[in-house]
Amino acid sequence: MKEVREAGIYEVMADEACFNLDDARRLIDLQACDWINIKLLKSGGLSEARRIANLCKDSGMKVSVGSMLESPHGVIASMKLAHEIAPHLVHDLDAGWWYPSTLLTYVDGKVSTP
């Protein structure tokens, strides 16, 4: 990842390379990426995800929140974290299409709750 980043052609986002706070520290220390994408399920929940997000912000690392086909309730938790840490950025918040739910509404690429 670092070699691609240093080539300077593209910004590099760490996604599957970051599962926890130690992974985030390593990526930041190595300057291996420009962004870290946090997923609540992958990181062990909201508390650890928030710790990763705060480390990224304190280190000047861009951070976004993604989802892994969570239920609508999981996406709502991810939405709250995304709004808390970087409301101006694009995040990847999608629920599985097979969940029949009125908890989330997607309009023009934006997710909201009723």
Whereabouts are the PLM-identified features?
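Active-site-adjacent beta->alpha loops and helix N-cap segments on the catalytic face
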Residues: 1-6, 21-24, 44-55, 74
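Glycine-enriched alpha-helix->loop->beta-strand junction motifs that scaffold or abut catalytic
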Residues: 3-12, 28-37, 55-62, 82-89
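A cross-family glycoside hydrolase active-site/sugar-binding cleft signature
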Residues: 13-16, 39, 64-66, 92
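Short, composition-biased local secondary-structure segments
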Residues: 16-28
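Active-site-proximal loop/turn and secondary-structure-junction residues that shape catalytic pockets
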Residues: 18-20, 40-44, 69-71, 97
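Short, flexible micro-motifs
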Residues: 34, 47-48, 69, 77
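A polyampholytic, Gly/Pro-enriched intrinsically disordered region
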Residues: 34-40, 110-114
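Flexible C-terminal active-site loop/helix
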Residues: 68-114
